[in-house]
Amino acid sequence: MKLHELRPAEGSKKAPKRVGRGNGSGLGKTAGKGHKGQNARSGGGVRPGFEGGQMPLYRRLPKRGFTNIFAKEYVEVNVSRLNIFEDGTEVTPEVLKANGVISKVKDGVKILGNGTLEKKLTIKATKFTKGAVEKIESIGGKAEVI
């Protein structure tokens, strides 16, 4: 098989439905829309969520909660991801971004305790979990809140 011999799988491609192009096509005259009525008109049809006049589900369910506009969004990094650094490295949010561990700093970096840490590092972050601090300090590293 060569690249110019590649074909789509049998039955995976359908010819487009050409409506309103003569009665011989089977989709002429009313173009599959029937006679008159809301759905036959241009722009016809009901809005999404309309249930025929019955009180729709999105209005039957109660509103709940709110979005706290002061909520802080931290980028979470597990200690296992920090093994890419050399022993004795000072790891800061800027260093994490430069090495592709995180893409954005947002409101800060939170270090989580999932996985194992094999390198002795000085880690500076906005927040740490208890488990993360234990793992960092158990091998002689430092966890500093910035």
UniProtKB/Swiss-Prot annotation:
Protein name: Large ribosomal subunit protein uL15
SUPFAM superfamilies documented for this protein: Ribosomal proteins L15p and L18e (SSF52080)
Family recorded in the similarity comment: Belongs to the universal ribosomal protein uL15 family.
Residue ranges with Basic and acidic residues bias: 1-13
Listed Pfam families: Ribosomal_L27A
GO terms assigned for molecular function: rRNA binding; structural constituent of ribosome
BP GO annotations: translation
Keyword terms: Ribonucleoprotein, Ribosomal protein, RNA-binding, rRNA-binding
One GO cellular component term: cytosolic large ribosomal subunit
Subunit structure: Part of the 50S ribosomal subunit.
Function: Binds to the 23S rRNA.
Region Disordered, annotated ranges: 1-54
